[in-house]
Amino acid sequence: MREQLMAAETVTGIEWHDGALHLLDQRLLPLEQCWLTCTDVAQVAEAISEMVVRGAPAIGISAAYGLVLALRQRLAEGEGWEESLEEDFLMLGEARPTPANLFWALNRMRERLQRLRPGDDVLAVMEAEAIAIHESDREANLTMAQFGVEQIRKHQGSEQALLTHGNAGALATGGFGTALGVIRAATLEGMVEQVYVCESRPWLQGSRLTAWELAADGVPVTVVADAAAGHLMKTKGISWVVVGADCIAANGDVAAKIGTYQIAVAAMHHGLRFMVVAPSSSIDLNLATGEDIPLETRGVEELLEVAGIQVTADVEVYNPVVDVTPADLIDVIVTEKGVVERPDAAKIAQLMCRKRLH
């Protein structure tokens, strides 16, 4: 299956070449494919905060490359570059508050910086580390796809209907995708009859990005309104909900695209299985439960306006980007380190003690 998956990779949103970070502007998809080139850390931080690049793994990868750009500038400034670089770590860390992968990538880059030896080519070493973060995410995607397919096959081997929410595909990662990686792999195995994609308001990551990715791969896909998810579960024979994650707490609670929680509640009511697919870098053992995860809110214009035109009266707006799905609503968490069924704190701790693959 691995060779099939690698051959099927058709979409990428992150490229590093010619000493610059190149990002596919996800705000414009699918109508326009425009690549933005970032040559300094401020541009990378802005690209993250303004949703040019999104998806927790992709944000972490972009931040790692952003530090390489920052380091190049600081080294050129001369003495005191280590202290100045701390400002760049802070800038990138403040770009988005929720994705655990962002802080994981920054910490990994910091740790590599601290292990430098006299005579090392600092810039070359740190560039190699950022590339390794990118490549390891791609490898993790392939491994998770295989693990996820095994879970689906174990419970039902015939063709079936799946539901996903948000975008956890190639655009959100460094490779094949997390949730969409599993869905793509299941399709290659002849196990998917239909994929239903929630539009995922207000940024429409489902209808704009996920549907575009799956259609490009020839996966049978149908877009539905977010509010139709419960009705679909009742009438369309869906067997699995498969989603990604921005952050997973130590007890298995999952922060993900807003609307994931209510889908999980509906799935539990209808007896459907609920799968979360995310690399181990999305797990933060310093966060005991979902109550400890910082949850991002965004600007009012995302709900008040459509295509720049105000369509709602001037009223109070609350625009959370993510919500928390409690672990007891989740059947399985799939990572590159392994699979956790019916997650809890003990199982998550055991998973994270395994040999580091990512």
UniProtKB/Swiss-Prot annotation:
SUPFAM superfamilies: NagB/RpiA/CoA transferase-like. Substrate binds at R54, G55, A56, R96, Q205, A256, K257. Catalyzes the interconversion of methylthioribose-1-phosphate (MTR-1-P) into methylthioribulose-1-phosphate (MTRu-1-P). Disulfide bonds: none annotated. The keyword Nucleotide-binding does not apply. Keywords: Amino-acid biosynthesis, Isomerase, Methionine biosynthesis. Gene3D superfamilies: translation initiation factor eif-2b, domain 1 (1.20.120.420), Translation initiation factor eif-2b, domain 2 (3.40.50.10470). One of its GO terms (biological process) is L-methionine salvage from methylthioadenosine. Belongs to the eIF-2B alpha/beta/delta subunits family. MtnA subfamily. This is Methylthioribose-1-phosphate isomerase. It catalyses: 5-(methylsulfanyl)-alpha-D-ribose 1-phosphate = 5-(methylsulfanyl)-D-ribulose 1-phosphate. The lineage of its organism: Bacteria, Pseudomonadati, Pseudomonadota, Gammaproteobacteria, Pseudomonadales. The active site is at D246. Its EC number is 5.3.1.23. It is an enzyme of class 5 (isomerase).
